[in-house]
Amino acid sequence: MSADTLQIAYSPCPNDTFVFDALAHGRVPGAPALDVTFADIDITNGMAERGELDVLKVSYAVLPYVLDDWALLPCGGALGRGCGPLVLTREADADLRGRTVAVPSETSTAYLLFRLWAADTVPGGVGEIVVMPFHEIMPAVRDGKVDAGLVIHEARFTYQNYGLHKLADMGEHWEHTTGLPIPLGAIIARRSLGAPALTRLADAVRASVRAAWDDPEASRPYVMEHAQEMDPAVADQHIGLYVNEFTADLGEDGYAAIRGLLTRAAAEGLVPALGPDALAFP
């Protein structure tokens, strides 16, 4: 591994493999080489807090804890509309007051959106929060081990297969109350890489996104290799939902959404407050 190689971790989900395919396979001229580790977002959040690797895909929820050492890239992440986490239940109109809810992580953006939704809509609050691996949540709700489950990503397209009902869409609630897109996943890189390297990396990520859009079939082998037996049509839906203009560039609305989420979460005591320049790049 050359000194120029960056160690990166992102998830095996189709949006990440689609975005990074060209970059990971040396098809972006002048870009740094990548040494890729696949890890779920709960793992990468922990890596960020421990200062591991050079570049990570993390939850926006972890940013307030790590931005002293890590810079938020203005591209490569996941924001969008109509793509928020869902709360699923066995019964169509379940009351979640005092009920047990399974979540994939307590340091995820989905969890922040859920807590903000619950603060607005569940008088007295929900009951016990149980953290469990993402793939176990829908079966646990179906089997009555928990009263409700918070799910993300492809579960939007598959929850009916488990006989479950959508109680609420966290993204709809967020969009309705703020008018902003839903911040989900961020790309961060070590500030110690220095401004020139960070800028070069951001340019390379943007080029990788554009390459994937220009020739979607080129990324398909990489996407499907890591898509955990996902139906190709579901993988395409997943990419269509999570890879969008905010992936190429956060822009004004993207930054407003991130700052809005983290400011509101800080006001609820869920995360530390952000400094005024915390989101600046590089």
From Swiss-Prot:
Disruption phenotype: Cells lacking this gene require menaquinone-4 (MK 4) for their growth, and accumulate cyclic DHFL. The active site is at H153. It catalyses: cyclic dehypoxanthinylfutalosinate = 1,4-dihydroxy-6-naphthoate + dihydroxyacetone. InterPro entries: Menaquinone_biosynth (IPR003773), MqnD (IPR030869). One of its GO terms (molecular function) is carbon-carbon lyase activity. Pfam families: VitK2_biosynth. Pathway: Quinol/quinone metabolism; menaquinone biosynthesis. Catalyzes the conversion of cyclic dehypoxanthine futalosine (cyclic DHFL) into 1,4-dihydroxy-6-naphthoate, a step in the biosynthesis of menaquinone (MK, vitamin K2). This is 1,4-dihydroxy-6-naphtoate synthase.
